[in-house]
Amino acid sequence: MKGKRVIAGILLVGILATALAGCKNTNITKKEREKPVITLGSDSYPPYNYLNEDGIPTGIDVELATEAFRRMGYQVDVVQINWEKKKELVESGEIDCIMGCFSMEGRLDDYRWAGPYIASRQVVAVNESSDIYKLSDLEGKNLAVQSTTKPEGIFLNRTDERIPKLGNLISLGHRELIYTFLGKGYVDAVAAHEESIVQYMKDYDASFRILEDPLMVVGIGVAFAKEDDRGICEQMDQTLEEMRQ
């Protein structure tokens, strides 16, 4: 398991090093402002995308996208979207792409993808006093997920023989709500990206325990509409590859 965590870190470190280096110069010139704009849709999902104290989008994905699109000759406008309507928004052209710790697995036929640019573990977390230690211990329990996320599909479809039948699967519209439900004892467990759970615990001084066995290790990418033939996705994919080297 430690090996998989190391791999995820390696994928991220190389890209972030170049992204952060590229973001050191924060002076926006007139030439920069004249660049065409890419509208990137995401919801609040720390540490990947969130608003800082000044209300400005920041996070791993924001820094990465800003640097990648800068290299491609674009400036980025990060907008908060209803995550449940992401596919509709990108297909209508209201946003150009989706980026928010977005898992590629199971969605390869739904979008045109750039990436993966990072690997992430989908995991289950419980309260520290819980008697749940293995995935099989979730049998008959109540579990909360953010709606339309990969964990929701994992527990709905149960194509993995390790996934037990739950008592109830509760899908909530916002990331923060699943942790509130867990903390108050409304559910027995939550499932999400490991980094998101760890970040929530840091931000809110919460104490959850993450199960050792992951639900899945997934590749994270940038999603464009399936019919988007502008070539931006392919250029983005190439740029991300160059940033990894």
Region spans (language model):
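Periplasmic-binding protein-like
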Residues: 42-44, 119-126, 194, 202-240
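Ligand-binding cleft/hinge of the Venus flytrap
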Residues: 51, 65-74, 150-173, 201-205
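Extended ligand-binding regions for polar small-molecule ligands
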Residues: 24, 62-71, 129-132, 136-150, ...
